[in-house]
């Protein structure tokens, strides 16, 4: 409602009679307080007496409201934030919720109560949609937040060194800028449901109590905010995956390649599952039976020993196969195991966090048992393990092209540790143990932060290395199916042209058909001097800048630890060199692209 509308809602009030004015002038503070309450109550019933309601006569107290923000790579943070917001609204609290990609960072200065749920990507970095706020809070123009109360829930994976680092960074910076915690930060691991539910329950109880103390009547928000969509995937989800059939498993790297990359095709017929280019497919898997046997043999545990898992009793061999994480080590496992395996060397490892992190990254769980033998019961061992979690793979097909199928591009994890061959959990399941027509449990994980432009006439630049090319196959398939006018440019890198050119014939056909307008390939090991995608970006600086001036959207997919950082540095060099901006101006330009959703990353 405009100011003009507010002024004309009711007829003007007549002036008070002189005798009333004289009487009021003699009231003390206590009498004024009583009279204001009496008048307000009467005003609430004024309309029934034919009197105008005093809608603007008294200043309204500030409503008790909470802002709930989420920053997510795959959607988990958003789902938790939405649940927290729903809980608060059910308690009668006014809630404003948003994903950080849709939130104006400068608005943070005006917030009074804030809940933030954030994941972490790469080497402890915030998700791409949180970068603008992260930079603001850590920059020279960071606002004072002394009027803000906040709580942070971090989502992460404790097998990585910088566990929940983005949540830790936001939590610390809020406090440094003067904000006060509503609750201590919670760092939730892959199996985050219990931690997230407890955090949501605690914050809802606390804020409900605070709202009751507040004189303003909470105004529940009953209409979902704009942009909030119902998941299109029907009843199949992470908790209830669809039992799909494997259609194809084809190795697409050459026999001589050091990489084993598979093109996987899965049948979704009958599932009513829908996905968009940029989405991921969640894959549930069983651990390798040989790995389960090796672990039980090392511990001296009878495979038939009954334990409780998944809410029911079952043999420990079955539990380890289907319910517990065996291929990703964690600091928590090593510390817990050290309490049973009394070795001075192991004690030294857990005493130094940097050494522990390096040990975890390079030593599988089974090889911890080999190196430091110990005797544990089945119950003692499983208490050290995390629940098994699905793996997410970027979808490499467009449903407009393949219908009820979904395609994946899977890099199979294979390595040796102290002479023993090891294989990744999900990638080994898909490549080695899942037979054609065999069943694999899947679900669609939306990724709204990695989407083609709504305007299909806009040009796109796709930058990826290795299996990071997967979503770009889906992008170009989609544009070809739509006969889109927008130009497509692929910048792709891998070690060798002859061994590692993923989907070579398809890219050639797309180019021939007019749907791949420009392409640059970086083969890092085909010459003495290594060439990477970032080198191609710098080499094509003028052309890339021209595409940006034409409104191009840039997409980056691949390794977060090295490749994504090097690509961003190269993009900044392009903006500085071809765009004639200084370093600060280039950073601001890249931030502008982020805010306009013209610079999107899917890194892991």
Curated annotation (Swiss-Prot):
Matches recorded under SUPFAM superfamilies: Ferredoxin reductase-like, C-terminal NADP-linked domain, Flavoproteins, Riboflavin synthase domain-like
Reactions it catalyzes: hydrogen sulfide + 3 NADP(+) + 3 H2O = sulfite + 3 NADPH + 4 H(+)
Pathway: Sulfur metabolism; hydrogen sulfide biosynthesis; hydrogen sulfide from sulfite (NADPH route): step 1/1
Binding annotation for FAD: 327, 361, 391-394, 409-411, 424-427, 604
Residue span, FAD-binding FR-type domain: 239-453
The protein's Enzyme Commission number: 1.8.1.2
Gene Ontology cellular component terms for the protein in this record: cytosol
Cofactor(s) recorded in Swiss-Prot or TrEMBL: FAD; FMN
Record-given protein name: Sulfite reductase [NADPH] flavoprotein alpha-component
Residue spans crossing the bilayer: none
Residues annotated for FMN binding in this entry: 72-77, 119-122, 155-164
EC category name: oxidoreductase
GO MF annotation terms: flavin adenine dinucleotide binding; FMN binding; oxidoreductase activity; sulfite reductase (NADPH) activity
Keyword NADP attached: yes
Cofactor note as given: Binds 1 FAD per subunit. Binds 1 FMN per subunit.
UniProt-annotated binding residues for NADP(+): 524-525, 530-534, 566
Span of domain Flavodoxin-like: 66-204
Quaternary structure, from the entry: Alpha(8)-beta(8). The alpha component is a flavoprotein, the beta component is a hemoprotein.
NCBIfam families associated with the record: cysJ
Annotated family: Belongs to the NADPH-dependent sulphite reductase flavoprotein subunit CysJ family. In the N-terminal section; belongs to the flavodoxin family.
Functional note: Component of the sulfite reductase complex that catalyzes the 6-electron reduction of sulfite to sulfide. This is one of several activities required for the biosynthesis of L-cysteine from sulfate. The flavoprotein component catalyzes the electron flow from NADPH -> FAD -> FMN to the hemoprotein component.
Entry's Gene Ontology BP terms: cysteine biosynthetic process; hydrogen sulfide biosynthetic process; sulfate assimilation
Keyword annotations of the record: Amino-acid biosynthesis, Cysteine biosynthesis, Electron transport, FAD, Flavoprotein, FMN, NADP, Oxidoreductase, Transport
